[in-house]
């Protein structure tokens, strides 16, 4: 297993940037799109995906990057039988093979930067052995190795968890086998997106990995951005806090509403969710007398306006791989109040650049909300957070340099 190296990649080495799906446009997808312009300065970049997004289409057109995708958009097979039999791997492989010209360009390729997710790993079946591969493993397969994704938005099991785990045993064994096969491939490096993720990769798969953190574009989240009348613009009852991520138990959405009971704060949820989950959250918010506003997705400009107008950005997510949302909040000058778990510990210093709080101590959260409203705290936490972002090198240029060094270490 190779780790970061030293040196300089030869001019315009040919890099394929690939991910199975971009349609969700979560943190992982935003990070890739954010890094593509910087990567295109170091490499001759081609992008490939089975399920593109408008944001990816627009950026590739703007920067003149070749974007390769199938004529028919791929989506993961639905249903328990498909998950048990791992049909997504075979169907995604066929979709990769169907992309016009993809197999042909592999002969001229130098490097593959592959980001994990639905449909991603199967592309390795058609990658020649001579090509250096970097797998950015954002998290082990949570649906196979944890139970948080098998719970309803309120935390209740979708079905018996023991039976679910037993039913997924074949898919789990296949996942372990695939990851160990990737780790033993020559000219291959695996990186988590945080020290926490790297430790989880070791725990779940028994393989070592490096760390390649995501990045933040200062122009996308500028500290000097003017505040808009966000509550009026988005019709949210003020004061409000923001939580980002598709509504689920894993993202802690239900718990965030429970915590806000009695505070007078509304919750703006960015990320949407299944209709059943949103309906349940609406009823839960009513019972807690918490205002709830939901947006499936916002562009960067609207998201910045929403966050700037908030008292705080909060999250009670379970074992989040990397704390990207906190640094976005810090960049915009909005306090970050997050559960003291997972990757959040790597981007928030408690009481210095935000707050890390015990999940079940709601009184501590309420005190933190009061602290977040104080001008001195908002100023100092944001200043310290931005300094930490700079110290960690969380920007597209440093990301590109780190990826370059990883590939050089494989030669």
Predicted regions: what is each one?
Residues 30-34, 239, 246-262, 276:
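A conserved mid-protein helix/loop that constitutes part of the nucleotide-sugar donor-binding site
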Residues 318:
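Aromatic "clamp/platform" in nucleotide-sugar-dependent glycosyltransferases that forms part
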Residues 141, 152-190, 198:
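Membrane-proximal helix-turn-helix segments that form the acceptor-binding/catalytic region
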Residues 279-301:
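Nucleotide-activated donor-binding/catalytic signature segment of Leloir-type glycosyltransferases, i.e.
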Residues 49-54, 244, 266-281, 296:
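Glycosyltransferase donor-sugar binding loop
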């Amino acid at each position: 297993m190779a780790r970061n190296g030293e040196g300089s990649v030869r001019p315009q080495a040919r890099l394929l940037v690939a991910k199975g799906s971009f349609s969700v446009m979560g943190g992982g997808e935003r990070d890739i799109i954010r890094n593509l312009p910087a990567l295109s300065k170091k490499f001759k970049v081609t992008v490939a995906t089975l399920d593109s997004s408008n944001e990816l289409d627009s950026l590739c057109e703007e920067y003149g990057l070749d974007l390769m995708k199938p004529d028919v958009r791929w989506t993961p097979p639905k249903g328990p039988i498909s998950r048990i039999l791992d049909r997504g791997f075979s169907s995604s492989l066929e979709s990769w093979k169907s992309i016009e010209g993809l197999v042909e360009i592999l002969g001229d390729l130098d490097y593959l930067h592959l980001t994990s997710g639905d449909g991603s790993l199967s592309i390795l079946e058609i990658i020649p052995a001579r090509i250096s591969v970097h797998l950015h493993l954002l998290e082990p397969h949570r649906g196979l190795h944890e139970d948080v994704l098998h719970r309803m938005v309120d935390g209740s099991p979708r079905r018996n968890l023991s039976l679910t785990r037993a039913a997924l045993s074949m898919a789990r064994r296949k996942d372990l086998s695939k990851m160990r096969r990737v780790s033993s491939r020559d000219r291959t490096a695996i990186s988590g997106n945080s020290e926490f993720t790297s430790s989880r990769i070791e725990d779940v798969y028994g393989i070592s990995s490096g760390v390649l953190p995501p990045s933040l574009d200062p122009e996308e989240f500028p500290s000097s951005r003017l505040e808009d009348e966000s509550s009026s613009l988005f019709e949210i009852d003020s004061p409000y806090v923001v939580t980002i991520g598709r509504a689920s138990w894993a993202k802690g959405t239900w718990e965030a509403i429970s915590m806000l009971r009695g505070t007078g704060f509304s919750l703006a949820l960015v990320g949407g969710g299944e209709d059943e989950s949103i309906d349940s959250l609406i009823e839960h918010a009513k019972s807690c007398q918490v205002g709830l506003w939901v947006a499936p997705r916002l562009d960067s400009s609207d998201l910045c306006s929403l966050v700037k107008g908030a008292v705080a950005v909060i999250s009670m997510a379970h074992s989040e791989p990397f704390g990207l949302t906190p640094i976005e909040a810090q960049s915009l000058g909005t306090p970050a109040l997050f559960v003291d778990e997972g990757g959040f510990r790597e981007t928030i210093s408690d009481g210095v650049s935000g707050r890390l709080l015990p999940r079940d101590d709601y009184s501590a959260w309420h005190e933190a909300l009061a602290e977040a409203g104080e001008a001195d705290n908002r100023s100092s936490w944001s200043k310290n957070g931005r300094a930490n972002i700079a110290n960690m090198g969380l920007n597209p240029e440093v990301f590109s340099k780190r990826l370059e060094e990883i590939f050089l270490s494989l030669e």
